[in-house]
């Protein structure tokens, strides 16, 4: 990653766009389609590095996935829950934590088969014990560096037993891994979270015919019963609200802007950013609401707002906007008053330490940000000057810095800007279109 982008401040954003397909749903459509019976057709797939890593690993497990082409639907021939093959080579998950953690759950119960998962330098330093430990309690045989916490990860497929599992943090990846393992475990597997996390896995498993029940306060208890089979489906993947968030915030804070973002997923476990935009006093409306394959979608129209209010992010809302914290940090710099992000320790083990990286890079523009162990304190009403900043290889940091550059006086440079392609390959083209 050595690509440099130059961005001129003082321009506005006008126009309408469609953002790429939802990354979370793209991963899950591939994985669940692979273990369903019959064919699954996927439209709106996110053609980017992370979901393509998932596709590559599944091919090595014997799944017939054709070459995926940008903006083209494709069809998977599923192997059924018991049909995955033992691979002849190591499964490389690239930079994708979702790929590695969900595959750990998928493969733990594949009796008598052995698997090795690895990733790039960054992924191999991210914590995997949070998935490995609950799977081990179900009978999984999972090994890795640093007592199973770091990849490369070795999995000896074993007979799993259903159980009731409480997770220490609200994590969709941990929950999803346990639910996928539950498909192969004896009896019933129940996951109880401290707060509700993204529920794309539950919605999709249900659409494919799994015996899954969601109960408890705010849907924090998910129960799956093994023994059934999944049936292939037609999946239309909505636009990713995490990718849309860059334009939603940009149109709110860049003067004289108006942007319409079409066909965005509005799953209530993902719309925390709308709650924060409400408290900021942002000027937006949701149009053309509908539901496709159990996922609510709509278009979001955003206009510039004056006198935005500062905000606090803490507690149960975190899982609903965890990926939007970098761009909300940029927004906070232009609100009135002091904003605070708390309870966000999880960001320290993302692709980078996002708290540290966002503070370090935005300070180069002149932002006043104090880093805390679990978050950030951000002084508003900043006057940004141009700067040379660095994504530090993190896709969400790269795109957040691009939006920050629009509010800086003069011309800024973003180093390693090609990191954006991990989740949004056309980001720079869309930025040029909206600012032209």
UniProtKB/Swiss-Prot annotation:
UniProt-listed InterPro entries: Enolpyruvate_Tfrase_dom, Enolpyruvate_Tfrase_sf, EPSP_synthase, EPSP_synthase_CS, RNA3'P_cycl/enolpyr_Trfase_a/b
Binding site for 3-phosphoshikimate: 23-24, 28, 171, 173, 323, 350
Compartment(s) where it occurs, according to its Swiss-Prot or TrEMBL record: Cytoplasm
Class of this enzyme: transferase
Keyword Cytoplasm recorded: yes
GO molecular function: 3-phosphoshikimate 1-carboxyvinyltransferase activity
Keyword annotations: Amino-acid biosynthesis, Aromatic amino acid biosynthesis, Cytoplasm, Transferase
Listed EC numbers: 2.5.1.19
Active site: 323
Reaction catalysed by this enzyme: 3-phosphoshikimate + phosphoenolpyruvate = 5-O-(1-carboxyvinyl)-3-phosphoshikimate + phosphate
Pathways involved: Metabolic intermediate biosynthesis; chorismate biosynthesis; chorismate from D-erythrose 4-phosphate and phosphoenolpyruvate: step 6/7
Residue sites binding phosphoenolpyruvate per the record: 23, 97, 126, 173, 354, 396
A Gene Ontology cellular-component term: cytoplasm
Presence of the UniProt keyword Cytoplasm in the record: yes
Entry's Gene Ontology BP terms: amino acid biosynthetic process; aromatic amino acid family biosynthetic process; chorismate biosynthetic process
Subunit structure: Monomer.
Function: Catalyzes the transfer of the enolpyruvyl moiety of phosphoenolpyruvate (PEP) to the 5-hydroxyl of shikimate-3-phosphate (S3P) to produce enolpyruvyl shikimate-3-phosphate and inorganic phosphate.
Family: Belongs to the EPSP synthase family.
Name used for this protein in its record: 3-phosphoshikimate 1-carboxyvinyltransferase
